[in-house]
């Protein structure tokens, strides 16, 4: 049988292929098992989704684990449909998984059964906007009636702030606190929005969860993990080359995994930094059309600021006179406006050391554009 590539870039392939996060996992599991909800905050590509699935694997079998990603949702009715579809049927026995049983709970929408390859039914819900809150209330009532321990992880939870409907936070908070045997994980990638939701006294979820910011994995731990898997495949591994990779991409999980995945695939070991350049070249070329369209869809001020931040790698003072002069940027007011636009579009974000291009491969493309 062909050996699996140990450096997964999509999904969760089990504890054998999961790097470190031992302290975070222990803290996470302890919170759930002691009836505390968790807020997990990390930029995208740091591995928070993988951590959620890893924690779910570590929990006692008495917990049913449910996961939904709401990043692409635009309004409350889409959330109601996604939430109900994820929850309903997850806590039941096969006998209970009948349309008639589910229909008893849901009067605000029409549930339908979708056939699955494994033979188990999956429910879909046709939710009209006017009945979205009612459908959500019915889903929580369904959870209450099941009387069964569960963990529900909602990824990119800050997206609810983008919904046009008002009062969504307060409505969800009132329901969440009413199901004591269900624990919730609220994960998000926008620090400022998640911080506002859970750390500001003005918001309904204020101090209602354990806050877990997620940092990058320790370099030595990651090197040990990578070395073990290269050696297991009979391939050599140079820690110095790995350190170059780690520093180039600031230890961010997705980039390390993507590049290690391709180096391991070649079967020649990881022996030099030149291999990193080869893989990055391929990644940039593969995405060049997308990056070009993205770049030229921005206005001139945003294009110039993107290029300037990419050129610096980590731009400390983007509104300073020296930064503007060095990169030949427009007035401070124009740069400030462009920065707000780029941040809202998730094209740049702020680290402890300064502003960076969110997608590091896009940053590589921008530096080559210059």
Question: For each predicted feature, which ranges?
Answer:
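Amphipathic alpha-helical "lid/sensor" segments that cap RecA-like P-loop NTPase cores
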Residues: 224-290, 352
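Alpha-helical DNA-recognition elements
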Residues: 58, 171, 262, 341
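A short, basic N-terminal segment
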Residues: 1-38, 43, 349
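Short regulatory helix/loop adjacent to the ATP-binding pocket of P-loop NTPases
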Residues: 56, 191-209
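Conserved AAA+ ATPase "SRH/arginine-finger" region at the nucleotide-binding site
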Residues: 69-72, 210-221
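P-loop NTPase nucleotide-binding core
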Residues: 36-37, 41-46, 50-151, 333
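Conserved Walker B catalytic segment
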Residues: 122-190, 199
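C-terminal leucine-rich, beta-strand-based interaction scaffolds used for sensing/assembly
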Residues: 2-5, 285, 289-370
């Amino acid at each position: 049988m062909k050996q699996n590539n140990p450096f997964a870039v999509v999904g969760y392939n089990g504890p054998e292929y999961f790097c470190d996060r031992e302290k975070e996992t222990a803290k996470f599991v302890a919170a759930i098992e002691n009836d505390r909800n968790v807020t997990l905050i990390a930029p995208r590509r740091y591995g928070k989704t993988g951590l959620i699935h890893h924690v779910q694997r570590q929990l006692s079998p008495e917990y049913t684990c449910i996961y939904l990603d709401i990043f692409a949702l635009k309004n409350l009715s889409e959330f109601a449909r996604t939430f109900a579809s994820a929850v309903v049927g997850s806590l039941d026995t096969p006998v209970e998984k009948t349309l008639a049983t589910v229909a008893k709970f849901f009067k605000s929408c029409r549930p339908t059964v979708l056939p699955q390859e494994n033979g188990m039914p999956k429910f879909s819900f046709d939710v009209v906007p006017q009945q979205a809150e009612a459908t959500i209330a019915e889903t929580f009532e369904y959870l209450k009636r099941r009387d069964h321990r569960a963990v529900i992880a909602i990824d990119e939870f800050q997206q609810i702030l983008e919904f046009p409907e008002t009062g969504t936070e307060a409505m969800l908070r009132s329901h969440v606190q009413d199901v004591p045997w269900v624990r919730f994980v609220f994960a998000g990638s926008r620090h400022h929005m998640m911080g506002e939701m859970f750390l500001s006294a003005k918001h309904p979820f204020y101090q209602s969860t354990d806050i877990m910011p997620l940092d990058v994995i320790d370099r030595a731990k990651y090197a040990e993990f990578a070395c073990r898997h290269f050696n297991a495949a009979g391939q050599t591994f140079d820690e110095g080359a790995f350190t170059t990779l780690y520093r180039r991409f600031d230890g961010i999980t997705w980039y390390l995994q993507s590049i290690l995945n391709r180096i391991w695939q070649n079967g020649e070991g990881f022996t030099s930094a030149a291999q990193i350049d080869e893989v990055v070249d391929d990644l940039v070329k593969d995405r060049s059309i997308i990056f070009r369209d993205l770049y030229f869809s921005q206005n001139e001020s945003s294009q110039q600021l993107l290029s300037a931040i990419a050129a610096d790698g980590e731009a400390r003072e983007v509104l300073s006179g020296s930064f503007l002069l060095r990169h030949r940027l427009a007035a401070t007011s124009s740069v400030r406006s462009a920065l707000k636009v780029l941040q809202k579009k998730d094209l740049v974000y702020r680290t402890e050391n300064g502003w960076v291009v969110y997608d590091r491969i896009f940053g590589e493309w921008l530096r080559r554009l210059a």
